[in-house]
Amino acid sequence: MKQLFILDPIELINPAKDSSAALMQAAHRASLDIWVCTPADLQAKGAKARVVAKTIVPEPWKSLGEAQNLSLNEFHCIWMRKDPPVDEAFLYATHLLEVAERAGVLVLNKPASLRAWNEKLGALRFSKLMAPTLVASRVNELKEFAKEQGEVVLKPLGGKGGQGVIRVADAALGLDALLELVTSQEQMPVMMQKFLPKVIEGDKRILLVNGEPLGAINRLPKCGDFRSNLALGGQAEATNLSKREKEICEELGPSLKSEGLFFVGIDVIGGMLSEINVTSPTGVREVEKLMNIPLADQVIERLLANFS
């Protein structure tokens, strides 16, 4: 069985930490034929989608074959694992992948859903599970919401890994100037959420496969910061799901599955849904290490069940 992984340049991947590397190594252990490429390697000739890809032996890391020009129809499964930002190049890649999808190739996650589920805005489908949230461009509306909530967090809609996330009080000096900056002079919407003090106890990353939670870690912010993202120095610790967190997964699971979002990471703070990560969820290595769960192998097992 042939699987294609669409990634950032392979040279940038740290196999000790990277979830895509973990998935490729699990696929290798399952005796699957693995290929890699970047979004720039995708193409369409008429109504047929193609790719310039290389074989990879990911364990031990790594051995690459020569580049070959192949039809995407040759692959049983294609993983779209390019990290954000979801820019024009990313969006065009999803359209090219839909050509293969229409020909019967399984694409994970579903291209149309990758476009539709912005990692900040997608959570609004489940707003009752979230902290009070406003998405707006107008400074006056954002200031009024901040006044109502007292202390808020600003999030750029296209950000990743906690980049650009700002904690601010409603009476902060220079708030107008800050809001003008983050909204590009009221031309770009931004997400504003009530600040949750429980973030100091951790931000839980829960990984769902086909709508079911298979593993989780708790991420603690580094000293002097409220952001717990591992990329910003947060520390991961072992954890179990609370009753509330299980309820959140049960609420989200059917929608994720029906939308073709096979592999998803959700973030929960103090029992409140924060984000739904669908593009290239991380955390596999940490779950495997801290929880002693062969998560990547379980993901591939669930995938192969689709072909049995």
Swiss-Prot record:
Gene Ontology, cellular component aspect: cytoplasm
ATP-grasp domain mapped to chain residues: 120-304
Disulphide bridges, residue numbers: none
Catalytic reactions of this protein: gamma-L-glutamyl-L-cysteine + glycine + ATP = glutathione + ADP + phosphate + H(+)
Cofactor note: Binds 1 Mg(2+) or Mn(2+) ion per subunit.
Annotated residues for binding of Mg(2+): E275, N277
PROSITE patterns to which the protein is assigned, alphabetical: ATP_GRASP
Annotated positions binding ATP: 146-202
Cofactors named for this entry: Mg(2+); Mn(2+)
GO MF term list: ATP binding; glutathione synthase activity; metal ion binding
Key words of the record: ATP-binding, Glutathione biosynthesis, Ligase, Magnesium, Manganese, Metal-binding, Nucleotide-binding
Pfam annotation, one family: GSH-S_N
Origin superkingdom: Bacteria
Pathway where it operates: Sulfur metabolism; glutathione biosynthesis; glutathione from L-cysteine and L-glutamate: step 2/2
InterPro entries, alphabetized: ATP-grasp (IPR011761), ATP_grasp_subdomain_1 (IPR013815), Glut_synth_pro (IPR006284), GSHS_ATP-bd (IPR004218), GSHS_N (IPR004215), PreATP-grasp_dom_sf (IPR016185)
EC number: 6.3.2.3
Keyword Ligase: yes
Family recorded in the similarity comment: Belongs to the prokaryotic GSH synthase family.
Protein name: Glutathione synthetase
Lineage: Bacteria, Bacillati, Cyanobacteriota, Cyanophyceae, Synechococcales
Gene: gshB
